[in-house]
Amino acid sequence: MGKKKRSASSSRWLNEHFSDQFVQKAHKQKLRSRAYFKIDEIQQTDKLFKQGMTVVDLGAAPGGWSQYVVSQIGGKGRVIACDILEMDPIVGVDFLQGDFRDENVLNALLARVGEDKVDVVMSDMAPNFSGMPSVDIPRAMYLVELALDMCKQVLASKGSFVVKVFQGEGFDEYLREIRSLFDVVKVRKPEASRGRSREVYIVATGYKG
């Protein structure tokens, strides 16, 4: 039986992926993913991470963000990461594999955080996309709402939140909610984010909790 022919959209994505300068740079530098460059650009602009911080990384696999943050917070810092997918170990990262939407996984994650509040919550979570915005955007918004709920539980006063959000229905309301909870809120589109993608990154600092 012959191989199943790829759709035009998946073939285009693969061509874009392997010709992408950030994919090539990540491979050359032995980085986990091109997402490393997105969080690096955000750090250069917004200065979120400092030595000794505790950071929660949601949607962490394959580990690009965690890998970057470990280099910024040093040996006395902590990264607590979670993803439904497997992730190869990273020194300095406490990784929990499981579905963040599951209450048992959430409780296990909260137990790893412990009693102390964290300095930064970051989320690069995204659903499996169907290609139908009417389905995909609500799924994506559900995940970012969960990430914000996590902030409300674990983020220290004056802490920071960075979250990937897909522009569409619910985006403006979500942005308004974040602005009510943080002193300074910016919407970033890093150079390493594909131009055709609806994704942007909300960077919020000065949590009022």
From Swiss-Prot:
GO terms, biological process: RNA methylation
Any one GO MF annotation of this record: rRNA (uridine-2'-O-)-methyltransferase activity
Enzyme class at the top of the EC tree: transferase
Active site positions, chain numbering: 164 (proton acceptor)
GO cellular component, one term: cytoplasm
UniProt keyword list: Cytoplasm, Methyltransferase, rRNA processing, S-adenosyl-L-methionine, Transferase
Enzyme Commission identifier(s): 2.1.1.166
Compartments it resides in: Cytoplasm
Reactions mediated catalytically: uridine(2552) in 23S rRNA + S-adenosyl-L-methionine = 2'-O-methyluridine(2552) in 23S rRNA + S-adenosyl-L-homocysteine + H(+)
Binding positions (S-adenosyl-L-methionine): 63, 65, 83, 99, 124
InterPro entries recorded: RNA_methyltr_RlmE, RNA_MeTrfase_FtsJ_dom, rRNA-MeTfrase_E, rRNA_MeTrfase_gammaproteobac, SAM-dependent_MTases_sf
Domain TRAM: 191-209
Described function: Specifically methylates the uridine in position 2552 of 23S rRNA at the 2'-O position of the ribose in the fully assembled 50S ribosomal subunit.
Family designation: Belongs to the class I-like SAM-binding methyltransferase superfamily. RNA methyltransferase RlmE family.
NCBIfam families: PRK11188.1, rrmJ
Designated name of the protein: Ribosomal RNA large subunit methyltransferase E
Organism: Haemophilus influenzae (strain ATCC 51907 / DSM 11121 / KW20 / Rd)
Organism ancestry: Bacteria, Pseudomonadati, Pseudomonadota, Gammaproteobacteria, Pasteurellales
